[in-house]
């Protein structure tokens, strides 16, 4: 199953969404792709978002979605990935948009729940993940 959600607010909102997704996943694994929105918001909630993402089994972090903004040094998708309290084998920063769906599909198995969270164009990737998974059957 592939599920998408908006999580551009504080880490507590992301944590609630992930806790609900964990219930939906049941005995399956929860695999999450996350794209933070705005550099200033990411800077403020970096640790909270990272902790929330730790509720997943596997996490793929994209670069911050911040069109027209000036980057803040030290605030990035890579910095977000470093905040996720999971074994490094289960957290990846994927800077290449075209590789994200494949990363998620590679991690997913029967009964798993793949969830996209964040703002920007992350929600567009769900159909691509489903297509890859169908082709692999």
Give the location of each predicted region:
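ATP-dependent carboxylate-amine ligase
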Residues: 1-137
């Amino acid at each position: 199953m592939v599920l998408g959600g908006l999580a551009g607010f504080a880490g507590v909102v992301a944590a609630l969404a992930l806790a609900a997704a964990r219930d939906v996943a049941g005995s399956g694994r929860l695999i999450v792709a996350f794209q933070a929105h705005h550099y200033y918001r990411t800077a403020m909630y970096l640790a909270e978002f990272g902790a929330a993402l730790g509720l997943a089994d596997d996490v793929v972090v994209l670069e911050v979605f911040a069109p027209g903004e000036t980057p803040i040094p030290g605030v990035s998708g890579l910095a977000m990935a470093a905040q996720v309290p999971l074994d490094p084998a289960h957290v990846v920063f994927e800077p290449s948009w075209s590789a994200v769906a494949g990363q998620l599909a590679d991690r997913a198995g029967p009964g798993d729940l793949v969830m996209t969270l964040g703002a920007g164009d992350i929600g567009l990737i769900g159909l691509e993940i489903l297509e890859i998974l169908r082709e692999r059957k």
